[in-house]
Amino acid sequence: MLLVRKWLHTCFKYWIYFLPVVTLLLPLVCYPFLSISQKIYGYFVFTTISSLGWFFALRRRENQLKTAAVQLLQTKIRKLTENNEGLRQIRESLKEHQQESAQLQIQSQKLKNSLFHLQGLLVKTKGEGQKLETLLLHRTEENRCLKMQVDSLIQECGEKTEEVQTLNRELAETLAYQQALNDEYQATFSEQRNMLDKRQIYIGKLENKVQDLMYEIRNLLQLESDIAENIPSQESNAVTGNISLQLSSELKKIAFKAENIEAASSLTASRYLHTDTSVHNYSLECRQLFDSLREENLGMLFVYARQSQRAVFANALFKTWTGYCAEDFLKFGSDIVISGGKQWMEDLHSSREECSGRLVIKTKSRGHLPFRYCLMALNKGPLCYHVLGVLYPLHKEVLQS
């Protein structure tokens, strides 16, 4: 057993020589089984590996010898220091110095690591500082550009302010000039208005005189009609002719008044005192004309529009004498007109300026009654292209009613 242990100890002690020996012996073992080229290549490879193995083994053995020498030296020193108190103290002081040196090395390594870390932070900080400097330069350049723009805008604003002040002065001068012109025009308008008011008063007086004259004419016509009623029946044809002439004459006067109502209103100050539209002026003139026509008692007076084929005005005598409204007389095929209806409709739509004729009309209270009619075309005024007409009864009892 002791021999086995000794042999194992020797094997473990010199195991490093096993690889080089195996490397040298392997070609000899395999030599019979290799070809010539393999033998040459194998010797080269095995020789190289064996050389490396021997170098490794020698290096390993050298390290073992150094370690053994150091251990032997330490053992000798320990034995010497154990016997000598001074050497033992020196040895302990050396150990302490070695421990302090190790601690100092550890601290030095930590400081080096901290230094490396700080150097990294410093490099990083320098990089960030350079970036900040670059950004600062960029911002400075932008601020300089913005300052230049602000200066140019301030200068432009000053120029615009001067222009606005100049325009305000010119506008104030223009407004003052316009105000002066307006005052002058207002004074002129006041003078013209006073003049027109005077003319309107004068025209009103003339209209009153005209109405008085018309009233006298109607009285004279009434007297003539009373005289005509006393004429014997054998002179009825002559009387009918006189009635036609009188109707035509009176209707011409009314037509003249209707055509010239626009000229009369233009002489008054109403068109200058008001700012009405043309449609309002037209309706106002028509209303004034219809009011004046309602005051006429010549007969059943009406105004007929050819385009719309309807009556735009009719006085109250239609309803009083016949019991029907004016629209019933103006319809095609009306059963109210018993005789003369065809000629009546032709005359209403005729292009002649004046027409006259005779109708027999069915009334509600007196049966069939004869009427004389007279039609006249209006060529100007607010009722231009309309027809002014009148129906006059030939029986006395109708007039008396």
Swiss-Prot record:
Source organism of this protein record: Chlamydia pneumoniae
Listed name of the protein: UPF0242 protein CPn_0755/CP_1117/CPj0755/CpB0783
InterPro entries: UPF0242_N, UPF0242_PAS
Protein family (similarity comment): Belongs to the UPF0242 family.
Matches recorded under Pfam families: PAS_12, UPF0242
Taxonomy, superkingdom: Bacteria
